[in-house]
Structures are given as C-alpha cells and as structure tokens.
Amino acid sequence: MSRPLISFIILALAACSPGAPAESAPTGPQARDSGRREVAVFAGGCFWSVESNFEHMPGVVAAVSGFAGGRVANPTYEQVVRGGTGHIEAVQVTFDPARISYRQLVDRFWLTIDPTDPDGQFCDQGPSYATAVFASAAQKPAAEASRRAAAARIGAARFVTPVRDAVRFWPAEAYHQDFARLNPVRYGGYSRFCGRAARLRAVWGE
C-alpha cells in the first residue's frame, strides 16, 4: 500500500504482503455453480490480505478491496488513510450460497485476523485498519453466532471485533485490486514483515 510505512518496507525489500461450521447445506468445492449470488463485507485491516484470503475459497466468485463504514461518498485511498472519513478498509465478497454459506465465510474470517487488537491489524495500525463484520439484517444471526463461537475460543473479554450493520461499500482504486496475486513478491515481503502468520498462530494456535 502507499502508506509511508509500507512504502518504506517495499523499498527496503527491493520492491519485492472459527469455530466449526454450524450450517448444513449442499456446499463444497465439488458443488456446481448454482448461478445464485450473495454478498458479504468484511474489514480485517489491510484489504490486500483480506481479499487474498477469500478469493481462494471454493464458492467465492469475487473479492473486491474497498472501504465501508464512513460518511464520505466514493472516498479515495489517500482520503481514508489521512482520516476524517470514518471509513475503514474492507472487502466485498461475492459468493455462491449453494457452494459456501455465509456462516462459513464468517467462521473463516475470524481465523485470518487478530480480533483482540482494537487499533488495527499486525503492522497496520490506525483507525482505517479497524476490524468488523458488516452484516445485513438477514446475515446478522449467523454473524453473531459465529462471533460468539470464535470469542469462546480465545476469551470473550479479549474479543473486540464487532458485528456492524451493513452499509454501502465503495471499491478502492484499480491498483489495489488483486494486489497479492499480481504482486506476489511485494505482497509476500509485506506479509512477512508484518508477522501475520506468527501472530495468527499465537491467537488461534496451530
């Protein structure tokens, strides 16, 4: 990302980044595409990482990096990073509910973040890197149930990531989309520097 810290990291690296499913449904990698589409929105710090985590899941049709939760329409990345917009980095996940359920997506999301950090994620700290699940009224029961199950694993008092009401999602600039896939060396260097894997093991175990 173009934030000063990450820019420095990239240059320094020679420009090199829970609970068991509770729903029973005909889901899985072997299921055929039903043509149905639903949308989920997750904020887990750096949207490069969140997007990459979801786009490899069977049943996920698309993952788009962007912003949610704020007051400014069609914000730019620089506006969000500077602050004052109320937005946080988020990813909109489009999925086939016949292949993967919303609950399964939320369960997976917890395992890719540190939900005990109120100030950001890993080396990305600040208001724009806060975590959240943005859920519609229909999605909220599954999201809340998943949150309770995940919190029980690590201690409810430590678990700070909220389930928030669904709001409008704004896509980020084109150069942020598919960043991990298109820039594997740069993203890999960023991810290692941030210590994502080690921290996730510390929070969730092996």
Predicted regions and their residues:
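Bacterial N-terminal signal peptides that target proteins for export
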Residues: 1-8
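Flexible coil/turn and secondary-structure edge motifs
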Residues: 2, 13-206
